[in-house]
């Protein structure tokens, strides 16, 4: 065992071989490096697989031995200051190592085919491998200095990956937005680290926690300073994990390739903030105000993320807001003292969300030959539908991921989310009510996404649902064809620009590109042509893209059972509790308390009922766009009653506008901060150009004219220049003599 731990420090550097080899190859032998293009994917997967095997061995030893290992190298700068660099292996580290490596391998295998035709193939795999290196270094860090170094590297990699297609202005703006937003959190983190060192005199975690706890218990430090510096540390996690109010970068980060989105949302950037909170939880637990702040930010984030996802039409942005909401659950858990539930949901959500993002990539990959390669069309759920017959495997995997995120048993997220809900009732009934309500919203928007994507018919082949076959526009009413005139068709499925006012009852249409329309056939084609891989219809992805989906399905089905307490309090079968024993004991938690299965079953029935209600509402509104609502007497009678519609319409429009416009938070930031800062920058630029540059330019111009004047007086002869020079020197000496004599006379008297 000791020998395995002794080599744990090498883990972050194994994937680093890929970007270094690609860089040297392109520098020294570019032709040979590009000729073995696809081999770099195999190289990346192989090296990360070695790390995964190493991590699995460490995790097994953690479960069996409950052992915390720390290896340090001391770098002494002088007698008063020494910096220790090292590697820390504990339950949290081993969990993160398994997540990063397993999800990373699946994403790399998937990316080999997904990015095969991209000109930036080598740059993509170099950036992905360097991102894995940065995250592995972050989770194995033994002190705050190492944390900050790898923290910045993770941010840099995310910046490069989000802006991978930097020639697109939207992608360039998205990576800048992510970079600037995270600068706020990173600056807070740096100040917090320096503040903690000022208080404790140590960067190393174990020493820092002990010194800090002693100072708190002995009232050896001002509580206001402690709270302030701890808040700055938490600010870094808020920005990195897209928590309110620094969440605005997350949906725009979807401008990168879909495998990047899967990696960022499941195992790297957004998880880094959660990891930081978990790592510093022994410090936060002795500061009640910080724990209250963490739980408050978590509950606000989970609710806002769910409401913002309700009306999004971009499949990746819907999943992005889903990630924001689920990260709110994970952030809520440590805030209410539920370290185990936070770790549990971190695991289950990672695999479910990776499955959903890679599934969405398969969908987008199949839609691009039909609607074009613009994300506004290939990622638009309004143009999808009916993909079940074309993407049967993707459909099954996406459905399982959706059910897991909805909290339907026995899938993974059910067990972890229910544990958070149970603990939230003990902490605050208000927080518990919000969390349970958000469970219903999650089920609604996730099934809305699934139904719009896979059910009914392929809507891109409809020129207009109302029957105007010659029109180049199309709109769909969720109330059915016959009710479209009653409710001014276009409802939820209308599409608009971001700067337009959105209404649930607006009559809007979506224009299909004329080049794409020339490729289309009538929708009434025979099934013989449907099964062919033609540009007119989507087709299932290749095996290299489907294999990661199937593997992630296995994780989604079974990974939840590692945290189920089958044992009635005996820790032989509760794998997660055994895994977390050292950390939870350090946080003074007792895992031997009896597990109340009756209470768990009661709460589970309640939460599953809420989720099923959300699924039912989504099925009611989106499940039968074309036919079912025509024959649904309840819905037809509902829409025919004008008084009810008058009452319902303003409420729905307010909710829809709030969701579609992201709560107007982005608009507020753009108005107050972006325009304000740009205005200030223009003002300072104008001052610099006109005043500062004016002064320096004025001296230059004055010198020029003086020189020209002297040249004119001298006439271009050297003798004249010498005469003028001697004259000026003589005048200067005479003036100096008289001034010196006057000064001496004044001093004498």
Swiss-Prot record:
Subcellular location: Plastid, Chloroplast thylakoid membrane
Enzyme class: translocase
Listed InterPro entries: NADH_UbQ_OxRdtase_chlpt_su5_C (IPR002128), NADHpl_OxRdtase_5_subgr (IPR018393), ND/Mrp_TM (IPR001750), NU5C-like (IPR003945), Proton_antipo_N (IPR001516)
Stretches that traverse the bilayer: 9-29, 40-60, 89-109, 147-167, 185-205, 219-239, 258-278, 280-300, 327-347, 354-374, 396-416, 425-445, 544-564, 605-625, 694-714, 722-742
Record's GO cellular component terms: chloroplast thylakoid membrane
UniProt record, GO biological process: ATP synthesis coupled electron transport; electron transport coupled proton transport
UniProt GO molecular function: NADH dehydrogenase (ubiquinone) activity; quinone binding
EC assignment: 7.1.1.-
Chief place of localization: plastid
Recorded catalytic activity of this chain's protein: a plastoquinone + NADH + (n+1) H(+)(in) = a plastoquinol + NAD(+) + n H(+)(out); a plastoquinone + NADPH + (n+1) H(+)(in) = a plastoquinol + NADP(+) + n H(+)(out)
Domain of life: Eukaryota
Family per record: Belongs to the complex I subunit 5 family.
Subunit composition and interactions: NDH is composed of at least 16 different subunits, 5 of which are encoded in the nucleus.
Protein name from the UniProt record: NAD(P)H-quinone oxidoreductase subunit 5, chloroplastic
Native source species: Illicium oligandrum
């Amino acid at each position: 065992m000791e020998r395995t731990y002794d080599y744990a420090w090498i883990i972050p550097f194994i994937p680093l071989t890929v970007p270094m080899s690609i860089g040297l190859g392109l520098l020294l032998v570019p032709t040979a490096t590009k000729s073995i293009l696809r081999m770099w994917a195999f190289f990346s997967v192989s090296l990360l697989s070695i790390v995964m095997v190493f991590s699995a061995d460490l995790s097994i030893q953690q479960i069996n031995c409950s052992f915390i290992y720390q290896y340090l190298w001391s770098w002494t700068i002088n007698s008063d200051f020494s910096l220790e660099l090292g590697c820390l292996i504990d339950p949290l580290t081993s969990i993160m190592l398994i997540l990063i490596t397993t999800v990373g391998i699946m994403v790399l295998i998937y990316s080999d085919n997904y990015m095969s035709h991209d000109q930036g193939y080598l740059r993509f795999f170099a950036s992905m491998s360097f991102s894995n290196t940065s995250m592995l270094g972050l989770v194995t860090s033994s002190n705050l200095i190492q944390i900050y170094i790898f923290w910045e590297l993770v941010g840099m990699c995310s910046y490069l990956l989000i802006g991978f297609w930097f020639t697109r202005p939207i992608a360039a703006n998205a990576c800048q937005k992510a970079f600037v937003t995270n600068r706020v959190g990173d600056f807070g983190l740096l100040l917090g680290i320096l503040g903690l060192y000022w208080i404790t005199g140590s960067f190393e975690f174990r020493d820092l926690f002990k010194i800090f706890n002693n100072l708190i218990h002995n009232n050896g430090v001002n509580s206001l300073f402690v709270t302030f510096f701890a808040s700055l540390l938490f600010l870094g996690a808020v920005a990195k994990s897209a928590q309110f109010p620094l969440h605005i970068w997350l949906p725009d980060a979807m401008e990168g390739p879909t495998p990047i989105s899967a990696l960022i949302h499941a195992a790297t950037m957004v998880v880094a903030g959660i990891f930081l909170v978990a790592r510093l939880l022994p410090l936060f637990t002795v500061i009640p105000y910080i724990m209250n702040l963490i739980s408050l930010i978590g509950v606000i984030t989970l609710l806002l993320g769910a409401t913002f996802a309700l009306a999004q039409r971009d499949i990746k942005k819907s999943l992005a807001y889903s990630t924001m909401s689920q990260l709110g659950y994970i952030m809520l858990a440590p805030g209410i003292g539920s370290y185990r539930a936070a770790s549990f949901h971190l695991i289950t959500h990672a695999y479910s969300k990776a499955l959903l993002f890679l599934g969405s990539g398969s969908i987008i990959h199949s839609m691009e030959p039909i609607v074009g390669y613009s994300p506004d069309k290939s990622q638009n759920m309004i143009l999808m539908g009916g993909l079940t017959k074309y993407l049967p495997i993707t459909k099954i995997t996406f459905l399982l991921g959706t059910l897991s995120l909805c909290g339907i048993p026995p899938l993974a997220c059910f067990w972890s989310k229910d544990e958070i809900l149970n603990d939230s009732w003990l902490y605050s009934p208000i927080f518990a009510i919000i969390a349970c309500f958000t469970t219903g919203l999650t089920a609604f928007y996730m099934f809305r996404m699934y139904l719009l994507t896979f059910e009914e018919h392929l809507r891109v082949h409809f020129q207009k649902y109302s029957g105007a076959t010659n029109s180049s526009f199309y709109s769909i009413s969720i109330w059915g064809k016959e009710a479209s005139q009653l409710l001014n068709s276009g409802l939820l499925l209308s599409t608009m620009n971001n700067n337009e006012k959105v209404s649930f009852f607006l009559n809007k249409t979506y224009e299909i590109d004329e080049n794409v329309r020339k490729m289309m056939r009538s929708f009434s084609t025979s099934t013989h042509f449907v099964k062919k891989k033609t540009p007119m219809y989507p087709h299932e992805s290749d095996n290299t893209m489907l294999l990661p989906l199937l593997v992630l399905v296995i994780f989604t089905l079974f990974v939840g059972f590692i945290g189920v307490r089958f044992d009635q309090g005996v820790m032989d079968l509760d794998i997660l509790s055994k895994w977390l024993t050292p950390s939870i004991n350090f946080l003074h938690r007792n895992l031997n308390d009896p597990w109340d299965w009756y209470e768990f079953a009661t709460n589970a029935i309640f939460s599953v009922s809420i989720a099923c209600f959300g699924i039912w509402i989504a099925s009611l509104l989106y499940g039968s766009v074309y036919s079912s609502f025509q024959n649904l007497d309840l819905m037809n009678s509902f829409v025919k009653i004008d008084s009810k519609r008058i009452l319902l319409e303003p409420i729905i429009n307010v909710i829809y506008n709030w969701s579609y416009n992201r709560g107007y938070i982005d608009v507020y930031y753009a108005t107050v901060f972006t325009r304000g800062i740009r205005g200030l920058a223009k003002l300072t630029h104008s001052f610099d150009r006109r005043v500062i540059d004016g002064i320096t330019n004025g001296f230059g111009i004055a010198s020029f004219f003086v020189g020209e004047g002297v040249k004119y007086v001298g006439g271009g002869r050297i003798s004249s220049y010498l005469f003028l020079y001697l004259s000026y020197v003589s005048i200067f000496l005479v003036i100096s003599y008289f001034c010196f004599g006057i000064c001496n006379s004044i001093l004498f008297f």
